[in-house]
Amino acid sequence: MNGTEGLNFYVPFSNKTGVVRSPFEYPQYYLAEPWQFSVLAAYMFLLIVLGFPINFLTLYVTVQHKKLRTPLNYIPLNLAVANLFMVFGGFTTTLYTSLHAYFVFGPTGCNLEGFFATLGGEIALWSLVVLAIERYVVVCKPMSNFRFGENHAIMGLALTWVMAMACAAPPLVGWSRYIPEGMQCSCGIDYYTSRQEVNNESFVIYMFVVHFTIPLVIIFFCYGQLVFTVKEAAAQQQESATTQKAEKEVTRMVIIMVVAFLICWVPYASVAFYIFTHQGSDFGPIFMTIPSFFAKSSSIYNPVIYIMMNKQLRNCMLTTLCCGRNPLGDDEASTTASKTETSQVAPA
């Protein structure tokens, strides 16, 4: 084995020379240079400085403006809540541990940090699944006489949290475990060892199939059908120009969010899958650290995409930031009708 396994950790460094120490007790400078730990700390600080204001402001503006509290906006708000979980439960912890070059909070802190990071990532993934299903139902109209309403939106929210908990909670109760990963300053699922006493391999397979592959299949199916339907409706002019424009805008926004999610999370999932299928192989700590920390940027890009592509939210946000005055004027407020119209599409 080219790594060193302990009771609650796996360090990707051979202990032939006797230099490996517990990542819960000693700095891990034998894994990387001090400046590299400083870079990680600076990156986490940047995520906190950018992630908290963007996501908090999204929630605050929605509370302030009643016209934003529509069923189709529930899931993007859910994303903001999940991102704040990651900021407070994960990023602040990792910032502190990176400054010390080891996970100073011990196994219990590792469980909490790994739980919040996994929970936030899975809520984001399942939120995109629900968004895809919502857009598919509203635009493609597979069920006639269906009107998307608040109850459906609440059911979607519940699904995201139930599925996210089904992925993040088991390692806390004995099915797999959370351990420090990469440079040992943040924690995640144990992809590195078989660990028979916690049935580690079965959990990793379950997670990859149920909480990664199946959601992506659903997303691609829904958007494949959606793109086909929008193009067909536009060609046949079956709907009003206003409705078609609204559907295209919202669809474009969600597709960009999905692509951005894949760019951030597929590298992490791919590296994790490689490590899982090549346990004991030789790889450096940076091999897992870079995809892991890159994936954390999802807490920033999702709200940015939503704000930039949702004219109504952007208009309300500018009004809030500018103390009740919108420097762009009220022209964009006219998008309210087009945005909400898609939630009450008439039967096909």
Swiss-Prot record:
Record's GO cellular component, any one? photoreceptor disc membrane
List the S-palmitoyl cysteine lipid attachment residues: 322-323
Any GO BP annotation: visual perception
The residues listed in the UniProt record as binding Zn(2+), with positions renumbered to this chain, are 201, 279
Q: Which residues carry this modification: Phosphothreonine?
A: 335-336, 340, 342
Q: Where is this site: Plays an important role in the conformation switch to the active conformation?
A: 113
Q: Which residues carry this modification: N-acetylmethionine?
A: 1
**Topological domains (Extracellular): residue ranges?**
1-36, 97-110, 174-202, 275-286
Residue spans crossing the bilayer: 37-61, 74-96, 111-133, 153-173, 203-224, 253-274, 287-308
- Family recorded in the similarity comment: Belongs to the G-protein coupled receptor 1 family. Opsin subfamily.
Protein name per Swiss-Prot or TrEMBL: Rhodopsin
Task: Report the source organism.
Answer: Globicephala melas
High-level lineage: Eukaryota, Metazoa, Chordata, Craniata, Vertebrata
